Amino acid sequence: MKNRRSNISDSVRKELEFDKVLSLLEGFAKSATNKQRICSLSILHNPKVLNHYLDCLQEYQYIQSDTNFPRFEYINLKEVINYLKIENAVLTEDQFFDVYNASIWVNSLKHFLNNNDYDTPAILQLIGDLKKNLYLKKRIEKVFTPRRFIRSQASEILFGIRQDISNKRSQLDKHFQETMSHYAHLGYLDDIRESFADGVHLLAVSSEYKRKVKGQVRGQSNTKSITFIEPEKCISLNRELAHLYEEEKDEIRRILKVLTSDLSAHLEKIEAYFNLIEEVDFLDAKSQLAKLMQANRPKVSSSRAISIKKAFHPLLLIENNKKGIETIPQDIYFDDKHRVVVISGPNAGGKSIALKTFGLNQLMLQAGLFIPVHPNSSMSIFHDVFTDIGDNQSIANELSTYSYRLTRMKEILLKSGKSSFILIDEFGSGSDPSLGGELAGVFFEEIVNSGAYGVLTTHYGNIKVLVDQTKFAENACMLFDDTQLNPLYKLKVGQPGSSYTFEVARNVGLPEDIIEKARAGLKHGTVRFEDTIYHYQRLSTELQLAQEELSKQVLTEIGRAHV
């Protein structure tokens, strides 16, 4: 499956905080390759390719929930594979067991899938033609014990050497014990009687008797009261034993070299194991992120009928969950007749968060991640995502906020089209309200005419009116409790929002004469328009709250009925 990847600009990543999501995802990945892969993760816009990635994640989460699923632990075989390509190379003990454990896990996964009725076509495609094969496991077991010791049966030569070592040690122990008993009886030994150094048993002789003991002096205690002597009868036996240990070491190296050579013949299989482990590590990281964000898989299609239900801002949800604070989900819909949604309402009412919620979830989904929305949500795919969010000043180019935003707007208008998703916060701000509002109106018409989809936030009354008069656009507002003068952080599509400018001013105790003077300074039409929006939104909010309260009561009654 071919797919063209969109290169999301750094500004879009930063403004939508996609980089923070990727940082969380990177923290769950164990593979250095996957960490790098995550840092450069971009969005996909081939529905077939995207759905394949989402299928893999969904199937992985499904089978992973089974208690019999083989526990995944990342195994880095990169160095092993590089060594196996070098002639006469010898793997270390840890590297052999990395191959061993990888073989066990891959074969356990195959066994699990073969013996369960899970429908996992995407996972099976990921595994490819890897078949259950225990050769590598059994070959390593012929050499190593479960406790990582080299088996004596690994070769006839090693078996013989170890028998000789055992016999020689028995002789040595016998001679040493006899010698120690003899000198102990004569009273030549210190209370500790014996010591051990460099693999050799030594007599702990009181220094005053050192010349009476036959053997080779190996050292003295710090006080020089004890002299450590290797008994004469043991010297030749220790040399023979040391020689046998060297023979054992050489034979073990030969065995491991042969084993390495045997594994090299199966390099392709080991590479396939590692590729699968890398992919599962990536899936596991995405699965852990999904659990952290309480994320789901929405429906994805090439259709532009979009219905996003109960969408949370992923990062806000994580932060609020830590603090035990409720996060309010948002709903929004788009189709061919409603392509652009313009959100208005008071400051600190949640407009910007709502806009970022839809933008960030869109990026995450197209990057192959699950998102915190209701699973019955339907989403589409966009080739480009454009943003203009926040107070951006280009100090290097000496551009004011407004100049910068005009430059961004120019770029958006030049590059956007039917397959674009546009997100603009505080649309038209940064200049004189009357002039900025008029220019914003023209920009708005251009955005709508481009065929793009988008979410915009604004304070401008003329934009709210223009939206109402535009065929492919729709107003939306953030609900507000005008009694308590508190934002409800809930988006409602279908009506513009009031700024609640004078209501908030009264709430903070601003004198009424100042408020009335400010109202009198406004054009009569502006005051009437704002009052109309205010009263309409007030009724709408009251109705919304009443519906929610009724729903709670109904659910409570249903719960009681089932007790």
Feature-to-residue mapping (PLM):
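Short, positively charged
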Residues: 1-33, 203-216, 489-524
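Conserved amphipathic alpha-helical "coupling/scaffold" segments
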Residues: 1-157, 161, 266, 273-279, ...
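Long, charged, glycine-rich C-terminal linkers/tails
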Residues: 180-197, 287-310, 374, 474
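SMC-family hinge/dimerization module
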Residues: 197-228, 238, 301-329
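Extended, charged alpha-helical coiled-coil/arm scaffolds that mediate oligomerization and mechanical coupling
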Residues: 79-82, 118-191, 220-282
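Conserved small/polar residues in nucleotide/adenosyl-binding loops
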Residues: 561-563
